Curated annotation (Swiss-Prot):
This is Chorismate synthase. Residues 41-60 are annotated as: Disordered. It catalyses: 5-O-(1-carboxyvinyl)-3-phosphoshikimate = chorismate + phosphate. The gene is aroC. FMN binds at residues 125-127, 238-239, 278, 293-297, 319. Disulfide bonds: none annotated. It is an enzyme of class 4 (lyase). Pathway: Metabolic intermediate biosynthesis; chorismate biosynthesis; chorismate from D-erythrose 4-phosphate and phosphoenolpyruvate: step 7/7. One of its GO terms (biological process) is chorismate biosynthetic process. The keyword Amino-acid biosynthesis applies. It holds the Pfam family Chorismate_synt. Its EC number is 4.2.3.5.
Length: 364
């Protein structure tokens, strides 16, 4: 199975399954000298961790990360960083009834057809449990980006089902279980989720992620454009079915006179492009959005088939998130951080000595 690594200069490779012994990752390319401990990663892992609220899966995993290599006396050495998280709360018996049954909307059928066998326990490698290691690796990237380049990354839920944020208050994001920036909608979100859980159904969500302080010049046209790599990374998150950069699909109804980001010596007057022009960062905030589908692991009966080709009914048991978007915020942050880290190192390798006489623009 290929496709377990991302990046060229900052390379993250993950391994492990939902109900396996452990999850792990190897980070190659992290510069030496970065102060790093498990605590630097644990905060984001706790934000993603299951069982932290009544709106997420009841599976309780401490997700305590261990550094196995690449750090000496509290600093990165420039060699491969090995990270490990043990699985401690598997209940594989919950999945014994679907050993030969395909859950509609999941990867069961496609994994079976591609590999000729599959780990049916919680989806195995296709489970979002794997994203814990992406968050750990992303936390390393986030620390380097912030400490060395002053880049900050913040994600939030901008929409859950029919409920959208109408105001954006970053101080509210970490104060509620939804990572929602509009405090006036929290009661409606709570009521909506309570009714959803009663019905045994699930719902989709939209997650937004913003990176500020990104310098001009990141991105490698034409095939490694910054927005292309961001889209690639975000689409690699479980359940993501759509990615937008800047105004995204909203540009369909825009006129050229409306959507262009006008410039002056004082800076850009807008940011419809989401901080990327021609595949290269413009110095403005990078803005991306992802759409996550509702999980198909629900207690509402549905039609499917067995591995032997017989008709069957599926009622999913086990512990699942009624809205996977709630825990996707730190995952989206991590994937954006990994891409920015990779492109910073690539830019440094080729363009470190480039000096432009054009003034650097900011936001007015």
């Amino acid at each position: 199975m290929s496709g377990n690594s991302i990046g060229q200069n900052f390379v993250v490779t993950t391994f492990g399954e939902s109900h396996g012994v452990a999850l792990g990752c190897i980070i190659d390319g992290c510069p030496p000298g970065l102060e790093l401990t498990e605590a630097d990663m644990q905060h984001d892992l706790d934000r993603r961790r299951p069982g932290t609220s009544r709106y997420t899966t009841a599976r309780r995993e401490p997700d305590e990360v261990r550094i196995l290599s690449g750090v000496f006396e509290g600093k990165t050495t420039g060699t491969s960083i090995g990270l490990l998280i043990e699985n401690t709360d598997q209940r594989s018996q919950d999945y014994s009834n679907i050993k030969d049954l395909f859950r509609p909307g999941h990867a069961d059928y496609t994994y079976q057809q591609k590999y000729g066998l599959r780990d049916y326990r919680g989806g195995g490698r296709s489970s979002a449990r794997e994203t814990a290691m992406r968050v750990a690796a992303g936390a390393v990237a986030k620390k380097y980006l912030k400490q060395v380049h002053g880049i900050s990354i913040q994600g939030y839920m901008s929409q859950l089902g029919p409920i959208s944020a109408e105001t954006l208050d970053f101080s509210q994001i970490e104060q509620n279980a939804f990572f929602f920036p509009d405090a006036s909608k929290l009661e409606a979100l709570d009521e909506y989720m309570r009714e959803l859980k009663k019905s045994g159904d699930s719902i989709g969500a939209k997650i937004s992620v913003v990176a500020t302080g990104v310098p001009v010049g990141l991105g490698e046209p034409v095939f490694d454009r910054l927005d292309a790599d961001i889209a690639h990374a975000l689409m690699g998150i479980n359940a993501v079915k759509g990615v937008e950069i800047g105004d995204g699909f909203g540009v369909v109804t825009q006129k050229g006179s409306e959507g262009r980001d006008l410039m002056s010596p004082l800076g850009f007057e807008s940011n419809h492009a989401g901080g990327i022009l021609g595949g290269i960062s413009s110095g403005q905030p990078i803005v991306a959005h992802i759409a996550l589908k509702p999980t198909s692991s629900i207690s509402v009966p549905g039609q499917s088939m067995t591995a032997q080709g017989e008709m069957a009914e599926v009622v999913t048991k086990g512990r699942h998130d009624p809205c996977v978007g709630i825990r996707a915020v730190p995952i989206a942050e991590a994937m954006l951080a990994i891409v920015l880290m990779d492109h910073l190192l690539r830019h440094r390798a080729q363009n470190q000595d480039v000096r432009s006489h054009t003034p650097i623009l900011g936001m007015r």
